[in-house]
Curated annotation (Swiss-Prot):
One of its GO terms (biological process) is cellular response to phosphate starvation. The lineage of its organism: Eukaryota, Viridiplantae, Streptophyta, Embryophyta, Tracheophyta. SPX1 and SPX2 have redundant functions in repressing the activity of PHR2. It comes from Oryza sativa subsp. japonica. The gene is SPX2. This is SPX domain-containing protein 2. InterPro entries: SPX_dom (IPR004331), SPX_prot (IPR031142). One of its GO terms (cellular component) is nucleus.
Length: 280
């Protein structure tokens, strides 16, 4: 599957507030198609600078040795970086606060501990999604920059990627640490055999559904919640598991698309129990 289609299918699986914060891959491809290839195309594009362009845009493009179309493309790339960083840092801060709260609550009553355990599983899933968000956007940037260099004969991919490596959205050390701390909390709250089942993304859910059909199990697993609330929580957890599974599958497909390792390759995925979990 081509990257654009893979990214689109991934975005559809995400929660609404995530969707507009992924790489605008289609918009970048449209901008790229406006750029004429080769020296003749560059001369023609330069002649079009005079049209509706502002003096500031013309000056910036000329100073960088770019056509207006090229400057517009790079400007959109920079705007995308700002978008990634804002969303990533906002989510990371949210997860730090939530994890601190859960760490304090896990010492509460037995019923509350069961609810906390469920919330930790959901938080773990969201953080894995954010790791995938980082990796997918990085992959998209590398791919669109490769197309840009090929079309224009420029060599901006390497310097731009070097800049990307310093961006907050790509620096996931703290996030990876939070994921591991979540797993440690689950180890403390969950029996070993139960933990292994809960952590296996993509595994058959029939066993879990069978357990959920027992009234006593449903009640305790949700901290004594009323049936309607319990069903809603179970549905949210199922949706989260499906989304995480789809995210990991999409990322595996992207990584397996090429066996060639280069300076632009994503680092190896960190994982537990043989499962792929991206982190850097």
């Amino acid at each position: 599957m081509k990257f654009g289609k893979s990214l689109s299918s991934q975005i559809v699986e995400m929660q609404p507030e995530w969707r507009d914060n992924f790489l605008s891959y289609k918009d970048l491809k449209k901008r790229l198609n406006l750029i004429s290839g080769g020296a003749a195309g560059e001369r023609a594009s330069k002649r079009r600078r005079v049209g509706g362009a502002t003096a500031v845009t013309v000056t910036a493009a000329a100073a960088g040795g770019m056509t207006l179309e090229q400057a517009g493309f790079v400007g959109l790339l920079d705007a995308e970086l700002d978008k990634f960083n804002f969303f990533f840092l906002e989510k990371e801060e949210e997860y730090v606060i939530k994890q601190k709260e859960l760490r304090e609550r896990k010492m509460a009553s037995a019923e509350e501990v069961m609810r906390v355990r469920k919330e930790i599983v959901d938080l773990h899933g969201e953080m894995v999604l954010l790791e995938n968000y980082s990796a997918l956007n990085y992959t998209g940037l590398v791919k669109i920059l490769k197309k840009y260099d090929k079309r224009t004969g420029s060599m901006i991919r390497l310097p731009f990627v070097q800049k990307v490596l310093q961006q907050p959205f790509f620096t996931t050390d703290l996030l990876y640490k939070l994921v591991k701390e979540c797993e440690e909390m689950l180890d403390q709250l969950m029996p070993t055999n139960e933990h292994s089942v809960a952590s296996e993304d993509g595994k058959d859910d029939s066993e879990g559904e069978e357990k959920g059909s027992k009234p006593s199990s449903s009640s305790s697993a949700n901290g004594g919640a009323v049936p309607g609330e319990a069903e809603a929580e179970d549905e949210r957890s199922t949706d989260m598991k499906s989304t995480v599974t789809a995210a990991l599958r999409a990322l595996r497909e992207i990584r397996s698309g090429s066996s060639t390792v280069s300076v632009f390759s994503l680092p190896p995925l960190h994982g537990s129990n043989g499962q792929d979990e991206p982190g850097r």
